[in-house]
A protein has these predicted regions:
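Intracellular juxtamembrane helix-capping segments at the cytosolic ends
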Residues: 140-155, 265, 345-358
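C-terminal ends and interior cores of transmembrane alpha-helices
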Residues: 106-122, 315-327
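Cytoplasmic helix-loop-helix junction between adjacent transmembrane helices
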Residues: 134-174
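Helix-loop boundary and gating motifs at the non-cytosolic
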Residues: 21-82, 234, 238-281
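Hydrophobic core of transmembrane alpha-helices in multi-pass small-molecule transporters
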Residues: 43, 125-142, 252, 332-345
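A late C-terminal transmembrane helix in Major Facilitator Superfamily
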Residues: 361-392
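Helix-to-loop junctions at the C-terminal end of transmembrane segments
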Residues: 84-97, 189, 292-305, 389
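C-terminal transmembrane helical hairpin of 12-TM major facilitator-type secondary transporters
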Residues: 307-347
Length: 426
């Protein structure tokens, strides 16, 4: 998690896709292609993961263990997710999403239970952090699974424009979940207290991810493991590292923007005594990103992905020139909306390139690789931003540096533009 993509890269021929269906109308909607059950459950299924991370931060600090340990706990969740995401992707490609999502949900619930027991019984810090890492590694990666499903649909239906709209929609869903998840976590801990809140979050995991599991169980034939035909259609099945690195770098830059702006914004509000506004203002970035994700998917095909990334990164860099002056709170909120537009543009473009370079039976693997880079970027941005934000404006300078690297990555995207290898032609 974490759209506007053009999908030229050579349409599937009968030799490369023996199972391809006849082309459908390019105007088919996402609802017609995916169905309401998939759209609803895939959105609900990613909300628990967005709730858990901040929920654990508030839980550990609210339980009296200190904000320092709470921050390290969240870092352990992020590290676990970064390590576990590629493995989850490979397992999904090999076994299909249903058994993987079930196993991940069970591991998450057991780890949350162990963390609750460790905190209540004054367990060692190492145990708490180990539980946090397991919780992160067992993230079922619903967003990546959803993107892989859309890619499969687009390839089977020979509908390049379907994936461009779908990736924009999926990024908007991710951003919406990033807004709603922290709100849900904050309300639960604030209204119920630490221990009841964690129990409620566990129930939320069961309901949210359980809904997606029920959908997968009822549509097993549509969401199975990679078939022999998939492997044949995907060629030798190897992911080109040279072509994968540029979109991975873009995701790393976007994650750094997320992490650095969060720490810099927190530092600004602490300095001004307006800490309560931090989450609200940060949500403006998510709103801008969600809107941009949808709009970018409507851009005409003459705008290549590399140009879109360059424009998105430039928007972020130029906006940071205003942020380093530390303007008033309303102005910062407006600037965060603009940064969100740049972020959304970069995200949908990077995931779009990732989809294009992925063999048919390795799509989930590529999507989770990009998710891993996004998570690592958030951790990098938060860590470096925390050091630099002793003077708040310096945190936004890190954001500006990430934007510059994003512009460089756009050149790499252009140089490594896929040839006649997949379903489209850029």
């Amino acid at each position: 998690m974490c759209g506007g993509l053009v999908y030229p890269e050579v349409p599937l021929s009968s030799s490369t896709a023996p199972q391809a269906q006849a082309p459908h109308s390019s105007q088919d909607s996402l609802v017609a292609a995916g169905g309401w059950p998939f759209l609803i459950t895939a959105f609900i299924g990613r909300l628990p993961a967005a709730t858990v991370q901040l929920g654990l931060l508030l839980y550990v600090s609210g339980a009296g263990l200190g904000l320092g340990l709470a921050g390290i706990t969240v870092a352990a969740v992020g590290l676990g997710s970064a390590v576990g995401a590629p493995l989850v992707g490979r397992l999904v490609d090999h076994f299909g999403p249903l058994p993987v999502v079930i196993a991940a949900t069970v591991i998450q619930l057991l780890s949350l239970t162990a963390m609750l027991a460790a905190v209540v019984n004054d367990g060692p810090t190492a145990l708490i952090l180990a539980c946090a890492a397991l919780i992160g590694s067992a993230n079922p990666q619903v967003g990546a699974i959803a993107r892989a499903h859309w890619s499969g649909l687009a390839r089977r239906r020979r509908q390049p424009r379907l994936i461009t709209r779908a990736l924009g929609y999926e990024t908007a869903c991710d951003e919406t979940s990033f807004i709603l998840g922290p709100v849900i976590a904050g309300l639960l801990v604030g209204l119920l207290g630490p221990n009841p809140a964690l129990l409620t979050i566990m129930a939320w995991v069961i309901v949210g991810q359980g809904a997606f599991i029920m959908y997968l169980a009822r549509h097993r034939t549509e969401h199975g493991a990679a078939t022999v035909e998939d492997t044949a259609a995907g060629g030798i099945g190897k992911i080109s590292i040279a072509k994968a690195l540029p979109p991975m770098m873009v995701c790393l830059c976007v994650g750094t923007v997320f992490g650095s702006t969060q720490t810099a914004l927190t530092a600004v509000n602490v300095l001004r005594g307006t800490e309560a506004y931090t989450g609200v203002i940060y949500g403006f970035m998510g709103a801008g990103s969600a809107v941009a994700s949808i709009l970018v998917s409507r851009l005409p095909e003459r705008f290549p992905l590399s140009l879109r990334v360059a424009i998105g990164a430039s928007i972020i860099g130029l906006t940071c020139l205003g942020l380093v002056t530390l303007p008033s709170t309303p102005v910062i909120a407006g600037l965060f909306v603009i940064i969100g537009v740049g972020v959304g543009t970069m995200l949908v473009s990077s995931f779009g390139r990732g989809e294009r370079i992925a063999p048919s039976h390795r799509i989930a693997s590529v999507m989770t690789m990009l998710t891993t880079c996004l998570v690592l970027g958030v951790s990098l941005g938060a860590a470096l931003g925390g050091v630099l934000s002793v003077q708040p404006e310096r945190g936004f300078m890190l954001t500006m540096a990430a934007a510059v690297v994003g512009i460089l990555a756009s050149f790499a995207l252009h140089i490594t533009k896929p040839g006649r290898l997949a379903t489209h032609q850029e």
